[in-house]
Amino acid sequence: MSTVTLLGERLAEVGTEFVYGGETDACEGCPYREQCLNLTEGRRYRVTGVRDSGTLECAVHDTGVTAVEVEPAPVLANVDANAAYAGSKASLVGPCPYTECPSHEFCEPDGADFDEEYQITEVVGDPPHDYCMLDRELQLVQFAAEE
């Protein structure tokens, strides 16, 4: 089910994914707060439609905001290979200090927390790294979009 919200003009394109960061100090006193701050903080969303409603001024987005339709988006993540089964639940294996690793974005994905379990909808396959610097056996999976 899609939700109508306001999004920065530069991000307002069908297919764009983002993690909602919540309210900032600049939002205080804004007349559009109700329409803009209606998503769940920390959740990943995908823009599914852009409304033809014009641009509104915004203290956060320098080019203003526009109305868009968004839906929760799935998250790609690396999990323990022994827990990687479609339909099962898994959690992230823990933080990784190797930020240059090609898998880092999947070991610490935006939109997922270390202390939560997520439903696996698909086992994508091997992660993009050749070997894990922490000796973890990992599989790349897709977590279900949170409703």
UniProtKB/Swiss-Prot annotation:
InterPro entries: UPF0179. It holds the Pfam family UPF0179. It comes from the Archaea. Coiled coil: none annotated. HAMAP family: UPF0179. Belongs to the UPF0179 family. This is UPF0179 protein NP_3406A. The lineage of its organism: Archaea, Methanobacteriati, Methanobacteriota, Stenosarchaea group, Halobacteria.
